[in-house]
């Protein structure tokens, strides 16, 4: 990880720091020519950070490109407003970077760290860049009044940390919807079965394989580079209006975004054709494709079910049961289910309300069911 990176030449004039007392004075004076960059994991930043600071994260794929000089610092910002703010002000403002506790900075070894790499890159781009002695911990201990703290514990997650490189085990995403998405995505743990009883809240840590090339997941899955690489995922279908496509600038993935909120008023079915075409394109190129929304239980599930219906000539019930067998906590909203029923009629498939006796078993209840094997046959068609 960080220790394996090739050391970046770190000239003595780069080892420039600012004290926490100096920063406090600038904040007290209301210095508008000060740009603070918080280099800690996003969940730590969201929990508490120095006022006016913006969060910067470095996934491994971007870290390598940054080190080679092929990626500008502005590409590291996942939020458009932060990227614009940095671009406007980095050439004129005093830029101060901080991590959790850089108290033993050494100019001879500093270039081996991510903080040193960022300082060098900012210098190369013409910025007046410094690091904060003692980091956030020291500043918070001495000048807590200039720290913004989120007392809402809803951002905490029991999911395992994402293995993304950065300062202090830096991660680039949180499953909190407070800043990213204010629409009506539901907590995966609140999903219910058809009888209204709650489903088990033990959802998979990684995206679920629906077909040998098709994976269903949540927003957090789309930020886990190790998992994307493990499953050969190169295509990412983002079924949200405003969750960022984090690695779009890196050039390693192909994205498609469907701007739909999880709300009864939304017409997701109008995007079925292009979503299905995108998934087929990935399959045709022998690439994995991840379909995700925020929680991974409603919008992305609806698109996945629609794909199975069209490509395997399955009724909505059949396709839904396949997905539910793989991922038990799915819970599309009723409007999306109605759109799937309309899609079923458009495809001329057997309705679940049909009184005709089906020639095959209707529901996929066990892995030994012959219709499940038909799903696997799609890989070779």
From Swiss-Prot:
Residues 176-203 are annotated as: Disordered. It is found in: Cytoplasm. GO terms for biological process: negative regulation of ERK1 and ERK2 cascade; positive regulation of apoptotic process; regulation of heart growth; response to nitrosative stress; signal transduction. SUPFAM superfamilies: (Phosphotyrosine protein) phosphatases II, Rhodanese/Cell cycle control phosphatase. Signal peptide: none annotated. PROSITE patterns: RHODANESE_3, TYR_PHOSPHATASE_2, TYR_PHOSPHATASE_DUAL. Pfam families: DSPc, Rhodanese. The active site is at residue 293. Ubiquitinated by the SCF(FBXO31) complex, leading to its proteasomal degradation. It is an enzyme of class 3 (hydrolase). Its EC number is 3.1.3.16, 3.1.3.48. Residues 30-148 form the Rhodanese domain. Residues 189-203 have a biased composition (Polar residues). Residues 206-349 form the Tyrosine-protein phosphatase domain. It comes from the Eukaryota. Keywords: Cytoplasm, Hydrolase, Protein phosphatase, Ubl conjugation. It catalyses: O-phospho-L-tyrosyl-[protein] + H2O = L-tyrosyl-[protein] + phosphate; O-phospho-L-seryl-[protein] + H2O = L-seryl-[protein] + phosphate; O-phospho-L-threonyl-[protein] + H2O = L-threonyl-[protein] + phosphate. GO terms for cellular component: cytoplasm; cytosol; nucleoplasm. One of its GO terms (molecular function) is protein serine/threonine phosphatase activity. Dual specificity protein phosphatase, which mediates dephosphorylation and inactivation of MAP kinases. Has a specificity for the ERK family. Plays an important role in alleviating chronic postoperative pain. Necessary for the normal dephosphorylation of the long-lasting phosphorylated forms of spinal MAPK1/3 and MAP kinase p38 induced by peripheral surgery, which drives the resolution of acute postoperative allodynia. Also important for dephosphorylation of MAPK1/3 in local wound tissue, which further contributes to resolution of acute pain. Belongs to the protein-tyrosine phosphatase family. Non-receptor class dual specificity subfamily. Interacts with MAPK1/ERK2. This is Dual specificity protein phosphatase 6. It comes from Bos taurus.
């Amino acid at each position: 990880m960080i220790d394996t990176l090739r050391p970046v030449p770190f000239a003595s004039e780069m080892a420039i720091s600012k004290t926490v007392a100096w920063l406090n004075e600038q904040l007290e004076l209301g210095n508008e020519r000060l740009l603070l960059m918080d280099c800690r994991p996003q969940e730590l930043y969201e929990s508490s950070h120095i006022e006016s600071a913006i969060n910067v994260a470095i996934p491994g794929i971007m870290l390598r490109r940054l080190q080679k000089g092929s990626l500008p610092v502005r590409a590291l910002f996942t939020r458009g407003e932060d990227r614009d703010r940095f671009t406007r002000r980095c050439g004129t403002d005093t830029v101060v970077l901080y991590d959790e506790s850089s108290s033993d900075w050494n100019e001879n070894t500093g270039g081996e760290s991510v903080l040193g790499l960022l300082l060098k890159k900012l210098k190369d781009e013409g910025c007046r860049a410094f690091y904060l002695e003692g980091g956030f911990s020291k500043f918070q201990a001495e000048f807590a009044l200039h720290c913004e703290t989120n007392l809402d514990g809803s951002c905490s997650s029991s999911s395992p940390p994402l293995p993304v490189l950065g300062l202090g085990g830096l991660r680039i995403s949180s499953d909190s919807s407070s800043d990213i998405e204010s629409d009506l995505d539901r907590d995966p743990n609140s999903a219910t079965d058809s009888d209204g009883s709650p489903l088990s809240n033990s959802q998979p840590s990684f995206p679920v394989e629906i077909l040998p090339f098709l994976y269903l997941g949540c927003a957090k899955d789309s930020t886990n580079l190790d998992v994307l690489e493990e499953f050969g995922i190169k295509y990412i279908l983002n079924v949200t209006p405003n969750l960022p496509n984090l690695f779009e600038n890196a050039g390693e993935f192909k994205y498609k975004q469907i701007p739909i909120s999880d709300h009864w008023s939304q017409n997701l079915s109008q995007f079925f054709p292009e979503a299905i075409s995108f998934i087929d394109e990935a399959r045709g190129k022998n690439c994995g494709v991840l379909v995700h929304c925020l929680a991974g239980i409603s919008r992305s599930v609806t698109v996945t079910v629609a794909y199975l219906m069209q490509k395997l000539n399955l009724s909505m019930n059949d396709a839904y049961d396949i997905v539910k067998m793989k991922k038990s906590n799915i819970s599309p909203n009723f409007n999306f289910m109605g759109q799937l029923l309309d899609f079923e009629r458009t495809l001329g498939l057997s309705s679940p309300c049909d009184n005709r006796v089906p020639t095959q078993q209707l529901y996929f209840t066990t892995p030994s069911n012959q219709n499940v094997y038909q799903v696997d046959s799609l890989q070779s068609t």
